[in-house]
From Swiss-Prot:
One of its GO terms (biological process) is hydrogen sulfide biosynthetic process. It comes from Archaeoglobus fulgidus (strain ATCC 49558 / DSM 4304 / JCM 9628 / NBRC 100126 / VC-16). Gene3D superfamilies: P-loop containing nucleotide triphosphate hydrolases (3.40.50.300). This is Probable adenylyl-sulfate kinase. Keywords: ATP-binding, Kinase, Nucleotide-binding, Phosphoprotein, Transferase. The lineage of its organism: Archaea, Methanobacteriati, Methanobacteriota, Archaeoglobi, Archaeoglobales. The keyword ATP-binding applies. Pfam families: APS_kinase. ATP binds at residues 9-16. Residues 134-155 are annotated as: Disordered. The active site is at residue 83. It catalyses: adenosine 5'-phosphosulfate + ATP = 3'-phosphoadenylyl sulfate + ADP + H(+). Belongs to the APS kinase family. InterPro entries: APS_kinase, P-loop_NTPase, Sulf_AdTrans/APS_kinase. Catalyzes the synthesis of activated sulfate.
């Protein structure tokens, strides 16, 4: 039994927290499981990759392929990645046989308060532009298999 859990949302929504909790739970139950964190994949495989739309699309495709291969080899794969556009997530859904989309829904004010990477602070100071979910577009999933209101519980 293998499948891919694709957790998508803007920075601070709770993707990593949710992914880590799922990973620990599934591993403790004896399942073969891997966690692909978008930031971690980027850091390890191509640390100099930028954040243009084309570069983010390439990053998304790489993560899709990694998840597809892991799942095909019997490993439950948890993906934690922004993937801001519905079309990108639909691409993942088409490429991955057993795909579960999880949306950690969280209001902007809560994400800004959490600000785990300091991105919202930088954006508000004008140091970065186009932050997904602030002044950069994030298309909320229309029909995810799971929605978690992460503002209700920070852990």
């Amino acid at each position: 039994m293998s499948f891919v859990i694709w957790i998508t949302g803007p920075s601070g929504a709770g993707k990593t927290t949710l992914a880590n909790a799922l990973y620990k739970k599934l591993e403790s139950m004896g399942y073969r499981v891997e966690l692909l964190d978008g930031d971690g994949v980027r850091r390890k495989l191509y640390p100099n990759l930028g954040f243009s739309e084309e570069e983010r699309w390439m990053h998304n495709r790489v993560v899709v392929e990694m998840a597809r291969r892991l799942s095909r080899n019997g490993i439950i794969t948890i993906v934690s990645v922004v993937s801001p556009y519905r079309a990108w997530r639909e691409y993942a859904r088409k490429e991955i046989e057993k795909f579960v989309e999880v949306y950690p829904r969280c209001p902007l004010e809560v994400r800004m308060k959490r600000d785990p990477k300091g991105l919202y602070s930088k954006a508000l100071r004008g140091e970065i532009k186009g932050l997904t979910g602030l002044d950069g577009e994030y298309e909320e999933p229309e029909n995810p298999e799971v929605v978690v209101d992460t503002d209700k519980n920070d852990r």
